[in-house]
């Protein structure tokens, strides 16, 4: 380890882990074990019209309720779902899901829908403030951005535009210590 002028050990800005200590984490650093980490950035992608939004909505509802998802343990937490392709159609999905899985019982579920248009690059600070304010300081476990294309005012094929989007998503991740998931169009 480098030393300062006084001979004291200096803390490294970029510490290196030795081969011997590198191992799979034994703690519960997941939202959905074997599928989603507890924090970071994730992207759900697939062919157009293959049901990505339906599948991810089902997955995050299992997180909100703390229910196993297809045989995988979940860590219960608050879900913020930004439905940028129009809230009306998405509300129909929510109502259908409630009927199917909650048997018509309207119980409290830590799921929050945001169905306004969003330019994540320009609006991420306001989004962080509004989420924090409306959740009373509670932190979401996951923020879903559906779709990446709708959240990006720019070209997803330009590295400069994508770098700005990732920086904005990272700000959400850091602010809440959560997973940010994009659904690709």
Question: Residue spans of the language-model regions?
Answer:
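Short, small/acidic-rich helices and loops at N termini and domain boundaries
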Residues: 1-10
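Conserved inter-motif catalytic segment of the P-loop NTP-binding fold
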Residues: 19, 26-27, 31-32, 47-48, ...
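Phosphate-binding P-loop
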Residues: 33-39, 71-74
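Hydrophobic anchor at the beta1->P-loop junction of P-loop NTPases
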Residues: 44
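Conserved glycine(s) of the Walker
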Residues: 51
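Hydrophobic positions on the alpha1 helix immediately C-terminal to the Walker A/P-loop
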Residues: 55, 59
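Post-Walker A helix-loop "phosphate-sensing" segment adjacent to the P-loop in P-loop NTPases
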Residues: 62-76
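Substrate-engagement module of ASCE P-loop NTPases
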Residues: 162-185
């Amino acid at each position: 380890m480098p030393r300062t002028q006084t001979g004291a050990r200096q803390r490294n800005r970029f510490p290196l882990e030795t081969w011997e200590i590198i191992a799979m984490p034994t703690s519960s650093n997941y939202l959905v074990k074997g599928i989603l980490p507890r924090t970071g950035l994730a992207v759900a992608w697939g062919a157009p019209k293959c049901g990505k939004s339906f599948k991810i909505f089902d997955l995050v509802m299992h997180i909100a309720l703390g229910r196993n998802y297809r045989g995988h343990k979940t860590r219960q937490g608050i879900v913020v779902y930004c439905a940028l392709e129009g809230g009306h159609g998405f509300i129909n999905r929510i109502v259908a899901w409630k009927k199917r899985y909650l048997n018509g019982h309207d119980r409290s579920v830590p799921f929050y829908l945001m169905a306004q248009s969003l330019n994540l690059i320009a609006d991420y600070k306001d989004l962080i403030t509004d989420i924090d304010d409306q959740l009373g300081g509670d932190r979401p476990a996951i923020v879903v951005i559906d779709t990446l294309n709708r959240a990006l005012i720019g070209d997803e094929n330009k590295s400069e535009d994508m770098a700005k989007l990732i920086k904005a998503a990272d700000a959400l991740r850091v602010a809440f210590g959560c997973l940010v998931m994009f659904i690709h169009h």
